[in-house]
Each structure stands twice: as C-alpha cells, then as structure tokens.
Swiss-Prot record:
It comes from Saccharomyces cerevisiae (strain ATCC 204508 / S288c). One of its GO terms (molecular function) is 4 iron, 4 sulfur cluster binding. [4Fe-4S] cluster 2 binds at residues 177, 231, 412, 416. Keywords: 4Fe-4S, Cytoplasm, Iron, Iron-sulfur, Metal-binding, Nucleus. The gene is NAR1. This is Cytosolic Fe-S cluster assembly factor NAR1. The keyword Iron applies. [4Fe-4S] cluster 1 binds at residues 20, 59, 62, 65.
Amino acid sequence: MSALLSESDLNDFISPALACVKPTQVSGGKKDNVNMNGEYEVSTEPDQLEKVSITLSDCLACSGCITSSEEILLSSQSHSVFLKNWGKLSQQQDKFLVVSVSPQCRLSLAQYYGLTLEAADLCLMNFFQKHFQCKYMVGTEMGRIISISKTVEKIIAHKKQKENTGADRKPLLSAVCPGFLIYTEKTKPQLVPMLLNVKSPQQITGSLIRATFESLAIARESFYHLSLMPCFDKKLEASRPESLDDGIDCVITPREIVTMLQELNLDFKSFLTEDTSLYGRLSPPGWDPRVHWASNLGGTCGGYAYQYVTAVQRLHPGSQMIVLEGRNSDIVEYRLLHDDRIIAAASELSGFRNIQNLVRKLTSGSGSERKRNITALRKRRTGPKANSREMAAATAATADPYHSDYIEVNACPGACMNGGGLLNGEQNSLKRKQLVQTLNKRHGEELAMVDPLTLGPKLEEAAARPLSLEYVFAPVKQAVEKDLVSVGSTW
C-alpha cells in the first residue's frame, strides 16, 4: 500500500454544506418569520402553500447528508434489484419469499386504487402469492408492539434514574425514524446521547421472522425477506451494520410496487379476491393474523408518545391525560395530571422546521428545566370525566415538547403517513395535507386496534431466541457547527 494512502483516507463521508446542494428559485412567497431567539415562527397554518420541488427526501437522502457508499446502498435496495435477485433465487427449490408490509403502505395502496383496506390487503397477498410464489406475508404490528414496549420500559427507567440522581431533565428522543436518526448522527452528534436506543418495527419484525424460522430449523439462507415501507430512508436503516442480522434483504415502497406492476404489465386489481383465509395461510407458524395485521392507538407512526403516557396513567389511577396542540399541526403533547401535578409528558414532533427549533432548544441551553404553571392548570381543570380535548381547551395551554420526558420525532411533515415512498403524488401542499388526514382517518376506522403494553412483554418472551432490539449509533464529529436557520433559509 502506498505511504500516501492511510486507513483514514477511506472514510468517504461528504460533510453537509450550509447551503442546500439542490437549491430552488422562490418567487412571490412569504418570507419565513424568525423571532429574536432565532426560532422559526410556524404558529399559523396557511390556507394554501406554493408548489415546491424540493422534498424532505432531497434534504435527508442527498449526497450532502449521506456518504457515497450509502448512495450505493440506496441503489441496491430497489424493485429492480428485487426482481433480479428473486428471479434467480426462485429457481432454487429450497428458497422461499417472505414479505412484510407496514400499515402506512397498506393504506396508501388502498387509497390509490380506491379499495377498502381489506380488499387491498387481499389483493397484495394474492399478487405476491401468485406471481412470486410468496410463502409468508405479515404486517409489522408485532414488531411495533415490541418496539413500543421496550421504548416505554426504557423511558420509565430513565425518568426514575433522573429523579433519583437529579440529572439533566432534557427529553429522550426517538430513533425509530431513520431520516431523523441519520440527520442527528451526521449533523448533530451532541444529541446522540439523547436518542432512545430501540429499533424500529421494520427491524424488529425482521428479527422476529428470523427467530421464527430458526426455531423451525430453517436456515437464514433459505428465505428472502422483502419489506414494504413508507419512505426511502428505510432502505438505509436496513443497511446499517447492526441491522444486517435482522434478515431483511430488500426494502421497497408503494411507489415502487406500482412501477413494478407497470413493468410487469400487470393490473393490481386483477388480483382482487374475497379469500380472507389468506390472512391465516400466509402467516408464519405462531403468528396470529389478528395481531400482526392490526395496529394500535396513538397515531399512525406507532403512537410511542401516547403509549408511554398511557402506561404511566395505568400506574396512577385517577390521573387524567390531556392532549395539547402545538404552534402548528405537527406538534402534539400528551400530558398526564395527577393531584394537580404533571407526572408524565411525551410529545410528537414532525417536519424539518420543527426539528430545527428542537435542535436549537436542546443545544443552546434554552431547553433547561423550568417550572410549569400548575396553578393555572389547577384553576382551569374540568371534571374528572372530561375527555382529553376538553381538558386541553380548559387549560388553555400550548404543547411544550422541549420539556417532555420523551419526544417522538418524525422527519416528514405530517409524519409517516406522508412518507416519500407513499402514493401521495399531490403537488399542492394543501391537497397533500388533506390526503394525509384522510389516511389517518382510515387508519382509525379500518384497522383493528390491539394493546401493545399488554402484548409486548408476552411477544418478546415467546420469541424463539433473543431479539436484536438496539442500534449502534455512529455520530460523526463536526469540525464546524452548522447554522440550521441558515440552512433552512435556502429552502
């Protein structure tokens, strides 16, 4: 090896630039309002936003934020690669196909093709069974249940430790959104210690599938696992070094499903069937279709924040949960009150602009602990039977995610139901938002709901082998502190 070439030269990380590498010309739009603290003011919801050509995936998955080697990984996770690889593997008698699909993808396909969720599920199962000889097809709820259960367990333990030691009260941050995880590791490594180390439903589902087959003496090489996910960053998640043992071979999105059908000259609706026995016949041994095809309360991204507060509420009979909306629709706080005290709080926060403010709050020191106005809450409390929204209105308070115990962060505005890989082709921002609202409504109406807090420990205990539940974070040291407001102003 040449003396001029060292091991350190092999790191091909491309440091993010202050200016976006994919700029756009904006004319006639309103300027962003930045207050005296350097925070974006997003207190109002515009009636209609201008059409834009830069998406979140441009920001989080371009060469400004990922390495060139990761770009290769993205290209290796596509429907074309799946068709090529499975075309070869399917010729081997000892190989079989397993498909896992997230609830967001199922709802997106149902909405796109104008079908009920059940009809779309059966159509998708029938398509993969008949065209690719798929042996098993599962929903990702079992993986999500375990992910939620471990998350809640860790938040509660962390909070007890902080109360006993008087440690810093900054919130824990979720790591289940790969877009936010990548962004944090490579631009804000000082936030990495705040990340709660629990894998996403995608990866835990893969680990569960592998454990199931190992218990049946089926070698890892005998099956090919295709995962259908709502965003392209899920491809990078499956390619993380610690994720390779989870047994996911390829990740594609609903957009790629539609493209694949077009390339195969197939009509999705031609696979319509009323054979509901597919739910059971395509479930692996020990997998209850009433569970893995279900969902849970708390939101379409998993409901981690809601489920944590619910878990604490069960430990404190008589406590009341209130739901507080933030400055914009992408911020929500679940606050638990008991004897006029806030005993637990968790928030949902989505979108790059809200993430900018979150990072600024948590890194500038302005996110230090402050006393909440409990007196105001005490005076304005309604009766114990008031529902969450009535209580939120009565307190006249605004969500304060920066002082929560835990923040469920999602990179996409509108969260996972607005993932870049979904079939939400509306360019008009208002119509796109309306589509997300429609999908969220369908999620609550068409999916059966299960209790992850009860089922989580049981599923983990029933697993045939210990599951891989944690990431190995890889923060990148930054030579120069990035000015997030400057970055945002180029959008």
